[in-house]
Amino acid sequence: MKLRRERFERRNGSGKNSQSSSSWMVTFTDLITLILVFFILLFSMSQIDLQKFKAAVDSIQKEGNGLQPDQTSIEKKNTSPSDTKKQEDQQDQLLKKVNTYIKDNHLKAQMTAKRDERGVVLVLQEAVLFDTGEAKVLKNAETLLHQIAVLLQTIPNDIQVEGHTDSRNISTYRYPSNWELSAARASGVIQYFTSKEKLPSKRFIAVGYADTKPVKDNKTNEHMKENRRVEIVIKKSKTTSS
């Protein structure tokens, strides 16, 4: 009778082996549950940190303008009324000097001078310096550029040379657009000053504006002619020569 009972228990999975198997399954299930809870907690914590990080970034972005004022604002704050008046007087004297030089050297037909927020500006029309659609300085223009170089040698300020075009599109192998043409013209003028006249290259910067800064609308040939120009900007400086 006892033997039959043992056989029955073995067939039906009862006994110690069955109990051990069930206990193992319970332990494994508990372990999986704990791991799942652990990762849920980690995910929740990471979400909280991410929200805090986003909030901090938003706060910095809102205050960004106050943390990084532009250079112009700094200069304005650091410039006293007396310094501003002095700089204005220096610019007036420089413009007067330039106009006197232009008159004495009979250059009025080839260039003009003006003053704006950049400094004192020498304006040269395209026909004086280049062939249409080209950036190589004309041989005939070298006399004019030499006279300008003589003037610049007496002025310690930095110089910005700007190329400008009219609104007509250009598309050549050398100059795919007005941007390349205007920049090449500015660079060509600087190349003459630094290579032929031996002016320090560190004083110069070349800028090409294409047709983005016209002085007239481009509705007539005469207006387009005025827009095709090179501007030599004698930049403002505390050491402006009188």
Swiss-Prot record:
Keyword rRNA processing attached: no
Biased composition, class Basic and acidic residues, residue ranges: 1-12, 73-89
Transmembrane segments: 24-44
Transmembrane helix among keywords: yes
Domain of life where this protein originates: Bacteria
CDD domains: OmpA_C-like
Protein name in the entry: Uncharacterized protein YtxE
Compartment(s) of residence: Cell membrane
Residue intervals on the Cytoplasmic side: 1-23
Gene Ontology CC annotation, any one: bacterial-type flagellum stator complex
InterPro entries (alphabetical): Bact_OuterMem_StrucFunc, MotB-like_N_dom, OmpA-like, OmpA-like_sf
UniProt family annotation: Belongs to the MotB family.
Function: May be involved in some transport function.
Organism per entry: Bacillus subtilis (strain 168)
Coiled coil: none
Membrane topology category: Single-pass type II membrane protein
